[in-house]
Amino acid sequence: NAYEKDSHFPGYYFQTSFIVAPSGDVILRYRRLNSMFSPSPHDVWDKYLDIYGLEGVFPVADTEIGRLAPIASEEILYPEVARCFAMRGAEVFTHSSSEFASPAQTRKDAAKICRAVENIAYVVSANTGGIRDTDLPPDSSNGGSRIIDFRGEVLRLSGPGDSSGASAEIDLTALRRERRKTGLNNTLIRQRFEAYAASYAGHAFQPANSLLKKDGSLRAPKREHFVETQKSVIARLAKKGII
């Protein structure tokens, strides 16, 4: 994923995951919803929906190698993101990330398995090959790329090194057969969304439209804004006794 400008939101940039077809055409763009210090579509939610609609928020690419949907970095920790893609038929989550590679299981590693099992989907997670010009150790992210099948099994895992990679066969026929089986393990089709909808609708944690003024103009996306927004959410939830 990379940072991308949008003429509808002058002065802003979004963290964008994208998929390029063999023709060279960009066939999918997804703007990261959960970002700490950069604008998110949710920060300008009403205007973003007016322009792109909800399907533009959760795009799925129907390709010859399956129905693909991107998950950006830390968002692997947010099950709702993957679920919204699965609702739209996603079969393979392409997870571009930059994270510490560790021989011990990290919380992101655990989340990758969970997202695969919950949605009966493949997770193809690609880590960065090193980090430069930061305060972080330059080789801290070498390794850790992996392919996880729809049962939660890690098919391939790359180790550290400048020329390490991971490859495995993705069996879409088996995945689709699994999704159409009856039984306990079909966690996707057994979802009872109506039972959860009211709880989601009745609670606001991170607020929508925090960068959108009432007159439709945009606030400057300064780092301080995101920190203060998070502090106010903590204070509000603590006052309610939620945290």
Where are these regions (language model features)?
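A generic structural signal for ordered alpha-helices
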Residues: 39, 59, 63-64, 90, ...
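Glycine-rich loops and low-complexity Gly/Arg-rich segments
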Residues: 25, 43-45, 52-56, 85-86, ...
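Short, flexible, solvent-exposed loop/turn segments with mixed acidic/basic and small polar residues
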Residues: 1, 60, 155-159
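Short beta-strand-to-loop element that shapes/binds the nucleotide-sugar donor at the catalytic cleft/hinge
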Residues: 1-6, 129
